[in-house]
């Protein structure tokens, strides 16, 4: 079977059209269904479209396009019809429906989805921060963090940090373990940005036993031992008292619930 040629034509970078095309292609056997992408980004003139049409004719290609400027879209449709080419307009039909539903004309500006604003960059910075300072890797992150989470192992510190990072908060988490003295800086930072994650002994015991099973280990390991858990929680409570920070009981809460509680505490304390 010959390679299917797919032209990606766009008045922006063409990412949207290519993602849709690749999603469709993924539904077919890659060994049997060979394909080739031909990219034509930043189409600005009718001459650019003429080139796309010429290549589509010469190579018997399918045109997958995203054009938001009405004059360019109309010209593309006209040339496709005249040349009887195979094509798909990725955005046009939905844009038409939305125009009617909103009773408002679209901006018709290429690349708007890629205009990265301050909020976007802030979120990316927060995500990178959460990865860099996960699990107390570097105490230098403590004064830079918007939120500092502390808790014993298996209190969802890492996933909670990532969830909050996607809401643009710079979060560092610090594990509390009896054998490891917390960094001095933890007691020097503003306690209002520190949140302690408390969990019941019973819940922690169940979670840790389940974790050991997943790892193919017996549940009698010290990690899930009741005496050990009591020791860890006692040490955790001592650290919390020393810091004087807010506490959230995560025993029966989903990540989303805990995140909302954290945000509410942080925002109320910043007022």
Curated annotation (Swiss-Prot):
Keywords: Kinase, Nucleotide-binding, Serine/threonine-protein kinase, Transferase
GO MF, any single term: ADP binding
Lineage: superkingdom: Bacteria
EC number: 2.7.11.32, 2.7.4.27
Keyword Transferase: yes
Signal peptide, first to last residue: none
Catalytic activity: N(tele)-phospho-L-histidyl/L-threonyl-[pyruvate, phosphate dikinase] + ADP = N(tele)-phospho-L-histidyl/O-phospho-L-threonyl-[pyruvate, phosphate dikinase] + AMP + H(+); N(tele)-phospho-L-histidyl/O-phospho-L-threonyl-[pyruvate, phosphate dikinase] + phosphate + H(+) = N(tele)-phospho-L-histidyl/L-threonyl-[pyruvate, phosphate dikinase] + diphosphate
Positions annotated to bind ADP: 151-158
Pfam families to which the protein is assigned, alphabetical: Kinase-PPPase (PF03618)
First-tier enzyme category under EC: transferase
Family, per entry: Belongs to the pyruvate, phosphate/water dikinase regulatory protein family. PDRP subfamily.
NCBIfam families documented for this protein: PRK05339.1
Protein name per UniProt: Putative pyruvate, phosphate dikinase regulatory protein 2
């Amino acid at each position: 079977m010959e390679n299917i040629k797919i032209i990606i034509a766009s008045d922006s970078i063409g990412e949207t059209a290519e993602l849709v095309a690749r999603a469709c292609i993924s539904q077919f056997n890659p060994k049997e269904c060979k394909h080739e992408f031909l990219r034509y980004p930043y189409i600005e003139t009718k001459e650019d479209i003429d080139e796309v049409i010429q290549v589509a004719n010469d190579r018997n290609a399918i045109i997958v396009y995203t054009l938001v400027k009405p004059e360019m879209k109309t010209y593309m449709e006209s040339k496709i019809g005249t040349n009887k080419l195979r094509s798909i307009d990725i955005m046009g039909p939905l844009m038409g429906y939305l125009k009617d539903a909103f009773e408002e004309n679209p901006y018709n500006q290429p690349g708007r989805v890629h205009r990265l604003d301050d909020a976007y960059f802030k979120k990316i910075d927060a995500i990178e921060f959460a990865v860099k300072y996960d699990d107390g890797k570097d105490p230098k992150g403590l004064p830079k963090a918007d939120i500092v989470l502390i808790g014993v192992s298996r209190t969802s510190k890492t996933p909670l940090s990532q969830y909050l990072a996607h809401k643009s908060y710079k979060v560092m988490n610090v594990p509390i373990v009896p054998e490891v003295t917390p960094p001095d800086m933890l007691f020097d930072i503003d306690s209002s940005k520190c949140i302690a994650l408390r969990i019941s002994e019973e819940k922690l015991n169940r979670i840790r036993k389940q974790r050991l099973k997943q790892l193919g280990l017996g549940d009698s390991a010290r990690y899930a031992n009741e005496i050990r858990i009591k020791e860890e929680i006692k040490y955790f409570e001592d650290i919390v008292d020393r810091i004087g920070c807010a506490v959230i009981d995560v025993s029966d809460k989903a990540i989303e619930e805990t995140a909302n509680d954290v945000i509410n505490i942080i925002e109320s304390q910043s007022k």
